[in-house]
UniProtKB/Swiss-Prot annotation:
Transmembrane segments: none annotated. It holds the Pfam family Ribosomal_S20p. GO terms for cellular component: chloroplast; small ribosomal subunit. GO terms for biological process: translation. The gene is rps20. Binds directly to 16S ribosomal RNA. InterPro entries: Ribosomal_bS20, Ribosomal_bS20_sf. Keywords: Chloroplast, Plastid, Ribonucleoprotein, Ribosomal protein, RNA-binding, rRNA-binding. GO terms for molecular function: small ribosomal subunit rRNA binding; structural constituent of ribosome. This is Small ribosomal subunit protein bS20c. NCBIfam families: S20. It comes from the Eukaryota. It is found in: Plastid, Chloroplast.
Amino acid sequence: MAKNLSAIKRIKTSERNRLINRKYKSVVKTLTKRCLLNIDNLESDNFNDVQSSISQVYSKIDKAVKKGAFHPNTGARKKARLARALSFAQKNRID
């Protein structure tokens, strides 16, 4: 256990930040899974639901990047994978 005051403060700060980052990551994972399920069940009548869920995931990813829970490249990669999944689903639905 740390003895000097600055080390004790750093332990408290890092634990607080770890919990905050974990919350952001958990929310992004949950929303991403929900969005991918919506994309898998894509039909013409629920396209607006898919668009709203994707915009919600994009918003949460951007907030997580802004707060430092994700590296900017990680956030961009997650958004690109969602966009690619939607694009493939739309192409397969049309064909």
